[in-house]
Amino acid sequence: MFNKFNTKPLWEVSKTLSSVAQGFEPADMVIINSRLINVCTREVIENTDVAVSCGRIALVGDAKHCIGENTEVIDAKGQYIAPGFLDGHIHVESSMLSVSEYARSVVPHGTVGIYMDPHEICNVLGLNGVRYMIEDGKGTPLKNMVTTPSCVPAVPGFEDTGAAVGPEDVRETMKWDEIVGLGEMMNFPGILYSTDHAHGVVGETLKASKTVTGHYSLPETGKGLNGYIASGVRCCHESTRAEDALAKMRLGMYAMFREGSAWHDLKEVSKAITENKVDSRFAVLISDDTHPHTLLKDGHLDHIIKRAIEEGIEPLTAIQMVTINCAQCFQMDHELGSITPGKCADIVFIEDLKDVKITKVIIDGNLVAKGGLLTTSIAKYDYPEDAMNSMHIKNKITPDSFNIMAPNKEKITARVIEIIPERVGTYERHIELKVKDDKVQCDPNKDVLKAVVFERHHETGKAGYGFVKGFGIKRGAMAATVAHDAHNLLVIGTNDEDMALAANTLIECGGGMVAVQDGKVLGLVPLPIAGLMSNKPLEEMAEMVEKLDSAWKEIGCDIVSPFMTMALIPLACLPELRLTNRGLVDCNKFEFVSLFVEE
């Protein structure tokens, strides 16, 4: 497939590149005195030059004959050079940044391309939202390669979203220049039980000869995993155990090792390589979801490479996992992923392999970052009005909106969602709760909080009620419109008054995340773009998120990235128990269940 993200297609400049390589024409740029990280052979080649022309690599080796009067010569001074880093699975919306601001944030860290799955904004605004993010990315040097959201809604019939995407929509988007594949196929039950919708969206992608990305979170790695892969799914980022990743790689599926703000799977999953001594060509490092304070403090793929090295993965192997392996996964290694003739001139300068310190970044033959700062301008994009006005709540939310009734009872046993810190799964617990004035009470002493999800897209007035455990909050409430994947309004708390204040605060500011205690807003992150993102700069967003994080701790929650963990409570494609605006969902059986356990 032609990668339209390059400056020029190879067929258009092939003669020039061949001439430059042979010294018949001068190069635009020559890098000298480098230590080349060759990801094709997993070796470092000392004292190597690279000649660049037309935004592509013309020659790797001795390039003295490629230097002309106007050739820009960059002396690497013995630094390593590697192919630009690629993030194979990322939801930009989770950064809370616009695409352009996200690019400004990650490019200086060596990221030259992302495979963006914009299913968050698509759940709110439909394919219009995808187009908005594509347009936002066009003014940046970052290669914004997009996968069409496959599961909008994530699990049909269990929640209300702002839009829906079907096979005919996927067929249309496969004609878009920016689309390189299908976003994560979360509806693995639909694949395994042969639903027309699930196989239809996969089929339209395969017809276009593009990559189908996956989401297989079941621990079963036999018939189910084989059936899932056989349908055409090429990769999966949902491995949380080494044996999961190893099973996928053995079946020819690219196992994506995730290390984001909340999901720290790398420590365990890296053992698939380090303990089994298998070939790593089917292993890819990805971030999935990264918050602004993480980007500001730790970086992006440079940090994930460093983490992989800390877990025992060889440095060159880790770099392969964000370059050639990723490019091959998306069938784009003829364009990206290696410093070899004909490929995009996307080059990262690394001072130290252990610390993965990035000093320069070149994209398409242009120096775009140096010393941790962007050296090129980025155009600002203004999102349309429908993106900035996405809170459509039918009824006024009051403390009474949070009543959970159980007439003629003194106590009752409820199904409670227990979170697993730093993991995407949950447990179903059965816990006895008190009833007062016919209303079921939460129990902060047992770490059991009330949870309500309000539909916010079509003013249906639907709301789902439940209880959650594991946040540690003793007094207060929190709310978010970042609530995967339908992104309805999720409110959690110990009392109805604070819960109502939290909900109404977000309605007034157009969406976001908030923490409340005793009638006071302690921390607020407004996200006016679809209730998911902001047009504020990284530094300002990181400061607001840090303040919100402190507010969470103030009300008693000390888990890592609590807002990310909270955001997954409605995601009905992940085991074990979830809450959507339609009710409580058993995600093993994929059926609604009663909030109360029958006695």
Swiss-Prot record:
<dbReference type="Pfam" id="PF01979">
    <property type="entry name" value="Amidohydro_1"/>
</dbReference>
<dbReference type="InterPro" id="IPR006679">
    <property type="entry name" value="Adenine_deam"/>
</dbReference>
<dbReference type="GO" id="GO:0000034">
    <property type="term" value="F:adenine deaminase activity"/>
</dbReference>
<dbReference type="InterPro" id="IPR032466">
    <property type="entry name" value="Metal_Hydrolase"/>
</dbReference>
<keyword id="KW-0378">Hydrolase</keyword>
<keyword id="KW-0464">Manganese</keyword>
<protein>
    <recommendedName>
        <fullName>Adenine deaminase</fullName>
        <ecNumber>3.5.4.2</ecNumber>
    </recommendedName>
</protein>
<dbReference type="InterPro" id="IPR006680">
    <property type="entry name" value="Amidohydro-rel"/>
</dbReference>
<dbReference type="Pfam" id="PF13382">
    <property type="entry name" value="Adenine_deam_C"/>
</dbReference>
<comment type="similarity">
    <text>Belongs to the metallo-dependent hydrolases superfamily. Adenine deaminase family.</text>
</comment>
<dbReference type="InterPro" id="IPR011059">
    <property type="entry name" value="Metal-dep_hydrolase_composite"/>
</dbReference>
<dbReference type="InterPro" id="IPR026912">
    <property type="entry name" value="Adenine_deam_C"/>
</dbReference>
<dbReference type="GO" id="GO:0006146">
    <property type="term" value="P:adenine catabolic process"/>
</dbReference>
